[in-house]
Amino acid sequence: MNIKRAKEEIEHTVKAYLAKDALGEYAIPAIRQRPILLMGPPGIGKTQVMEQVARECGVALVAYTITHHTRQSAVGLPFIRQRHYGDKDVSVTEYTMSEIIASIYAKMEATGLSEGILFIDEINCVSETLAPTMLQFLQCKTFGNQAVPAGWVIVAAGNPPEYNKSVRDFDIVTLDRVRRMDIEPDLPVWKDYARAAHIHSALLSYLELHPQNFYQINADVDGTQFVTARGWEDLSNLLDTYEQLGLQADEDLIKEYIQHPKIAEDFSAYLDLYYKYRDDYGVEEILAGQAKPAVFARLLQAPFDERLSLVSLLLAGLNTRFAASRQADAVADACYAFLRETKKALATLPDDLPDGSAELFSQQVADYDAETQRQREAGLLSRDGLNTRLQVQAELRRWEGELRRANAAGTQEAFELLRGQFQTLAEDREKAQQTASAALEAAFDFMEQAFAESQEMVVFVTELTVNPVSHAFLTENGCERYFQYNKDLLLDHRKAALQQELAAEQRRHGGM
């Protein structure tokens, strides 16, 4: 299965394993809660999936790479204890708590979450001394004499033997106690994730043209050459930061992430062209509605991959604006909700209490900061979610400063001041939405003049539809031309499907 399907199955499993009956007991007894065993090539996204599932299910996550552990840290350290059995005093060996089990309790204490996921990576690559412990863990859900706490779902991951020489096969007794999922690389599924994760547009455009270069692991006389989904994502993060700093990514740098020389060389050459197209065509000028006439003449002679790269650049510029608009929306919505709670709280204060409004607001802001920190430590915030809360914190702190400087005479005056601050924020949100909408209209003007209803327009409209950032913006704010083109595309798809059905029916009748 692909990683998206595996994520859905793990999410459903967590919900099922943590479901309780009318008496408050787990509906599926712990002994029947089979651990999940994910088997797949390295760098496919197994660890990230666990982070997403934990965040979306609202549970804690404790993750370990078991190859970093010795038997002592996994099982615990031995010590001697005196026992009295029958009429004899004897010395027996006991063990301290496993470091892994202890980390679960530490996570519960730090986050306040009593339920979670224990994720053990590279479980089939352990040393010979630790192998029996891992078998016991999968079969009995214990490390040494310490059981995994109730309410914690066990997920383990490993690599097939063709990817790792250290792999140990599990026997049938162990496999009969786990739920095994075999995961394969899937570019279309990864692209869905990549759009939501804001993966660099150059990578997505390149992989659209060269899908065979998404994931490869090849062994030859020179060693192992490979490129993985993890490599592409990590490179994307670096490229984003390099662009912000005005730094140039060269071929040597790319080879540090894409450890397949031919693919690294190919992508490096494409990236240089990608940046060249951005500058030559003036993407920002196009989105400002100021496309140069020479651009249209050049496109008439341009090969398809160049035209497709330009479409990708336009989409990247739009998505930056859509994301800014969405972020402004999220911050404004959160501040509005906060302001409503402040209004309720202010109504409970005596109007003549000195500095009462400022003190109350400061306490509310401090509580918001503490909740952000709690969710951050618990791993319950996505990257976008964390950015939103941090921006809200900064905005609220600014309001707090304005409120203290104003020295409001009463609660009503304090609230009016805060409402004025929010109005400025609402105006900023409106500007961000207008900027994005204007750029979208300019992009459609350019696309219609340059490509009309060609394949490039199909790609443009399709990407606007499938990208969650653009889709959310269009759903909220609309765009008449987008909806018209999207409707025409759907009609064309239905017509093509009907023609295929008719052709198949004719072939069947012709064969009779």
What are these model-predicted stretches?
Residues P35-L37, C57-H68, I80, D89-G116, ...:
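Conformational switch/transducer regions in large eukaryotic molecular machines and scaffolds
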Residues M1-Q212, D220:
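AAA+ P-loop NTPase catalytic core and its hallmark functional loops
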Residues L300-M512:
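Terminal-proximal interaction/regulatory segments of ATP-powered molecular machines
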Residues A196-D355:
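Alpha-helical lid/collar subdomain of P-loop NTPases
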